[in-house]
Amino acid sequence: MKKTAIALVVAGLAAASVAQAAPQENTFYAGVKAGQASFHDGLRALAREYKVGYHRNSFTYGVFGGYQILNQNNLGLAVELGYDDFGRAKGREKGKTVVKHTNHGTHLSLKGSYEVLEGLDVYGKAGVALVRSDYKLYNENSSTLKKLGEHHRARASGLFAVGAEYAVLPELAVRLEYQWLTRVGKYRPQDKPNTALNYNPWIGSINAGISYRFGQGAAPVVAAPEVVSKTFSLNSDVTFAFGKANLKPQAQATLDSIYGEMSQVKSAKVAVAGYTDRIGSDAFNVKLSQERADSVANYFVAKGVAADAISATGYGKANPVTGATCDQVKGRKALIACFAPDRRVEIAVNGTK
């Protein structure tokens, strides 16, 4: 009984800790991130065409905020709004920058997540970003790198990301994310405004971030199941013939009634204990009490109780309920009648409501 109660309490506490690790629904969060960006698809070809070197990697950073729409059964759904400096690519000639392409803008995306371990989510994001691309051209012959021209263009680009996020505390989470931005910018030379260069790179970046979740508070505590314990006592003279272990026909109605109550208990563990009176040898009484306990247990198994959820033990003449009441009684028939309360089968049922 005590072990069962302790186990249920521990299970309840474990469930509560899991709930505290996950973000709560209908709450907001905000964070910052930083990492490295890399330009791909078109940069190398453009550099070869104009016979310049290039730097594709740069520092990237951003801020983001989100609203947790759903978090149930390890599945989460949020909407995120952010602003990123997506990074920059540079064209280089003779050790000097001759062209620079920078990108920044806002983005909106849906974030779906799945909790793989307690407090650890993997996630994916898909959305759209409104990106402003700035192109700056420099005079490579000037030691001060005087700008010859500057041009910019805003364009919508697809944004996708995958990552992992860990809740250090219910209010604080860290994430590692790979993000890619598709077809960024569309440069048109100032002397040819109707002509666009075949240069629309996509930008991949790996970022580390940290976020604060608002309104988490104490997570809802999952209540431990209510412990249920029931005990039934059967008079052996009603259930069995004297000195026998076979169930009487009239015992069926009593056992069926007990089974009906037993079936209302969840995760039930059943212990059947058989007892005899003090008449006869110890060996005979232990054997008889065990057989009677087995008969009752087998009846319940036949009704549907799992065999591994029920036990049967015979205790012989142990634990008499008559005490010293029959010590002065004389005669076998009188003793048999007096000892009747000792001849019993007790059924203990423990589980949850």
Swiss-Prot record:
TM region positions: 27-37, 58-69, 77-85, 104-115, 120-128, 158-167, 172-179, 205-213
Keyword Nucleus in record: no
Topological relation to the membrane, as annotated: Multi-pass membrane protein
Position of the signal peptide: 1-21
Gene Ontology biological process terms in this record: monoatomic ion transmembrane transport
GO molecular function (one): porin activity
Annotated keywords: Cell outer membrane, Disulfide bond, Ion transport, Membrane, Porin, Signal, Transmembrane, Transmembrane beta strand, Transport
Cellular component aspect of the GO annotation: cell outer membrane; pore complex
Cross-referenced CDD domains: OmpA_C-like
Localization (cell): Cell outer membrane
Site, Part of salt bridge gating mechanism: residue positions: 80, 175
Annotated Pfam families: OmpA, OmpA_membrane
Disulfide bonds: 326-338
Sequence ranges assigned to domain OmpA-like in this UniProt record: 227-353
Summary of the function given for this chain in its UniProt record: With TolR probably plays a role in maintaining the position of the peptidoglycan cell wall in the periplasm. Acts as a porin with low permeability that allows slow penetration of small solutes; an internal gate slows down solute passage. Reconstitution in planar bilayers with lithium dodecyl sulfate-solublized P5 yields narrow pores (58 pS conductance) with a low probability of opening, whereas n-octyl-bD-glucopyranoside-solubilized P5 forms large pores (1.1 nS conductance) with high open probability. The large pore easily converts to the smaller pore at room temperature; at 42 degrees Celsius the smaller pore converts to the larger one.
Family membership: Belongs to the outer membrane OOP (TC 1.B.6) superfamily. OmpA family.
Additional facts recorded: Cross reacts with antisera againt E.coli OmpA.
Free-text note on domains in this protein's UniProt record: The extracellular loops are most variable in sequence, and in some bacteria confer sensitivity to phage and/or colicins.
Subunit organization: Monomer and homodimer.
The protein's name: Outer membrane protein P5
Species assigned in the record: Haemophilus influenzae (strain ATCC 51907 / DSM 11121 / KW20 / Rd)
